[in-house]
Design a protein with these regions (language model features):
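Short, surface-exposed beta-strand/loop micro-motifs that present aromatic residues
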Residues: 175-182
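Pocket-forming structural segment of enzyme catalytic cores
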Residues: 96-173
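Cysteine-nucleophile active-site neighborhood
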Residues: 55-127
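Extreme N-terminal starter segment of soluble prokaryotic enzymes
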Residues: 7-12
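Structural signature of beta-strand start/N-cap positions in the alpha/beta core
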Residues: 34, 49, 83-85, 147
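Beta-strand-turn-beta hairpins that frame and shape the catalytic cleft
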Residues: 145, 182-187
């Protein structure tokens, strides 16, 4: 992990009632970052990496983000190619929409989230291999086909002529689905790194290292004004989380 003397990038974790925020915050803190909960646009301030975690369905998730006034700022963040990590539902929300409930989502990735097929047992819960399609700094010092933890019934399917360039890794459980994507500073994973043991922490550490090397925030590039924020106190919480209550 990153030595404590190095700069700790500020990470904003979107709190919209659909994620295990404390475990995500704890994992990021272990990885060398500082964590802040994002509940309104003004909380973004000097955040360097925006993380959208989550479990559940797309429609209520988008409704909560809209009610918090965060849909526009998140879209602006993505359009500005600022550092972003979507985890599980957070990855699915990057697509145009979801077949689960017909919701229109953030539209950063052309394609839709569709139910797993090909004989997969639903929901797909547990450890499974992540097989890389290409090398990427997020998987540095992580062996190919390493096991990560999944909890979901749907997965995003990129479309269009450049869809293949977006995919970092795939996983097979009855059928193959996209388990990691990257485009510029936009990252997304279907697995839960905060629940995936040493490899999950290594993944988060790699992301934090990428943000650190990229430098601090350019205030002029921020899509929202700086405002008061809620810091996360997660130091006493275990990284491993209890069983989830809902499944995407």
């Amino acid at each position: 992990m990153t030595p404590a003397r190095e700069r700790r990038p500020l990470v904003g974790i979107v709190d919209y009632g659909a994620g295990n925020l404390v475990s995500v915050a704890r994992g990021l803190e272990i990885a060398g970052a500082e964590a802040r909960l994002i509940r309104r646009p003004e909380d973004l301030g000097d955040v360097e990496l925006l993380v959208v975690p989550g479990v559940g369905a797309a429609a209520p998730a988008m409704a909560r983000l809209e009610a918090a006034g965060l849909v526009g700022p998140i879209r602006a963040w993505l359009e500005a190619d600022r550092w972003f990590l979507g985890i599980c539902l957070g990855l699915q929300l990057l697509f145009d929409g979801s077949d689960e409930d017909g919701a229109e989502t953030l539209g950063a990735i052309r394609g839709r989230t569709r139910i797993l097929s090909g004989g997969a047992r639903l929901p797909h819960i547990g450890w499974n291999q992540v097989e890389r399609d290409r090398d990427h700094p997020t998987f540095e010092e992580i062996p190919d086909r390493a096991d990560f933890y999944f909890v979901h019934s749907y997965a995003g399917r990129p479309e269009g002529p450049t869809a293949g360039e977006l995919v970092l890794a795939e996983t097979t459980d009855g059928s193959s689905f996209i388990s990691a994507v990257a485009r510029g500073r936009m990252l997304g994973v279907q697995f839960h790194p905060e629940r995936s043991g040493p490899y999950g922490l290594r993944f988060l550490g790699n992301v934090v290292d990428m943000v650190r090397r990229d430098g601090g925030v350019d205030a002029a590039a921020s899509p929202v004004e700086t405002g008061p924020a809620v810091e996360v106190a997660a130091s006493a919480v275990q990284v491993a989380a209890p069983a989830v209550e809902s499944v995407v």
